Amino acid sequence: MRKIISLIHLSLDGFAAGPNDELDWIAYDEELEQDAHALHALTDAVIWGRRTYEGMASYWLTVPGNPASTPAELAHARWLDDATKIVVSRTLERIDWNDAHNTVLIKENIAEEINKIKQQPGKDIWFLGSTMLAQTFMQLDLIDEYRININPTVLGRGKPLFAGVTREIPLKLLESKTFKSGVVALRYEPNRT
C-alpha cells in the first residue's frame, strides 16, 4: 500500500507558517533543497488543500517559461507536472493544471477517498497541505510518515501545526539529522500497534 509522507517545516515554537502564511523564516538552503528533492524518487503524487494548490499553481506553472529559474526549480516543476495532483476542497469545481489529466479533486469523504488512492498502484504520496488540512489528516490517521524540519527560529505567533489535533498520536522515531543551517530533520511513523 502507498504511504502518505508529510513534509512540514516548523519554527522552534511549533508554527508551520507566520500569521499571514509567511514562510520566509524557513532556513532553506541547498542542503534542505536536496533533502526535499530526494522525495521525488519516492513519490509520484502530491496532496494539497485549495489554498496551497492555488499558490503552487500560480508559481510552479510559470517556472518552465522563466529564464531565471534554477535547475532545481525546473526539476521540481517537471516533477509536479508529472505527479498526480490530489486537491482536497469543498469549494473548487475543477483543477486547472496544464491538461489536468493527472488531477484528483476530493470534495467529501476524505478518509474513504484517500484510502482508495493509497490502494492504487504507484509510489508514495507527498502531503504538502495547509495546517488545517494536516490537522484533518492527523485526526483521520491518514499520514503514514511525518517529516518535520524544526527551524532555528521562534516566531512567537502564526499557524500552529497541532492546534486542531484532539487525539493522541504515538510516534516512532525513524531518523534524525541536523543540517548546517541549524535545521533538525525528524522522521517519524505512527506507532499504530
Specify the residue positions occupied by each region the protein language model found.
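Portal/gating segments that form or line small-molecule/metal binding sites
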Residues: 1-142, 152-193
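Short, conserved catalytic or interaction motifs in soluble domains
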Residues: 145
